[in-house]
Regions:
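Bacterial N-terminal signal peptides
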Residues: 1-6
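Beta-sheet-dominated interaction scaffolds and their linkers
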Residues: 10-52, 122-124
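Short strand-edge motifs at loop-to-beta-strand transitions and within beta-strands
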Residues: 32, 45, 82-88
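Short, solvent-exposed loop/turn segments enriched in Ser/Thr/Gly
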Residues: 39-46, 93-102
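Buried hydrophobic-core signal for structured, non-transmembrane domains
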Residues: 45-51, 88, 101-106, 118
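Short, acidic/polar linear motifs in exposed loop/turn regions
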Residues: 52-55, 94, 109
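Surface-exposed binding patches on compact interaction domains or structured appendages
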Residues: 54-82
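Terminal connector regions
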Residues: 96-124
Length: 124
């Protein structure tokens, strides 16, 4: 999955599965669909964030709408025109039916934002 980050308050193009690019003047969005997930299982997917700016960017932290979903962010800065892998993990314990969560990634460039949308269908 490739995610591109941008630097502004404007939304980028429609979110695409596992892809995003950081560029000046937009919010990079990515959509992660886990599909059917067995109840009480943890599942993981990865996506790539590409730095389309002219300065290195560090992915500092993230916020999530649910403690059942978390990210593993790279520790090193992403150089211009380079990319880094981010891992998203979803724990289906305590969830059922259709699940959707939103995560936002804070970067070292305050005008560069990444929005991650996650969905899953919990089956028993």
């Amino acid at each position: 999955m490739l995610i591109v980050a941008s630097c502004s308050n404007a939304l980028a193009e429609e979110p695409t599965a596992l892809e995003a690019k950081l560029t000046k003047g937009s919010v990079a969005e990515v959509m992660v669909d886990f599909g059917d997930v067995q109840y009480s299982k943890c599942v993981t997917k990865s996506f790539t964030i590409e730095n389309g700016t002219d300065t290195p960017i560090v992915l500092l932290d993230y916020d999530t709408t649910c403690r059942c979903t978390w990210l593993t962010l790279p520790k090193a800065a992403i150089a211009p025109n380079e990319s880094a892998e981010v891992t998203i993990t979803f724990d289906s314990r305590g969830e059922w039916g259709s699940v959707g969560n939103f995560l936002s990634i804070e970067t070292s460039n305050k005008s560069c934002k990444v929005a991650v949308w996650m969905s899953a269908e919990i089956v028993r």
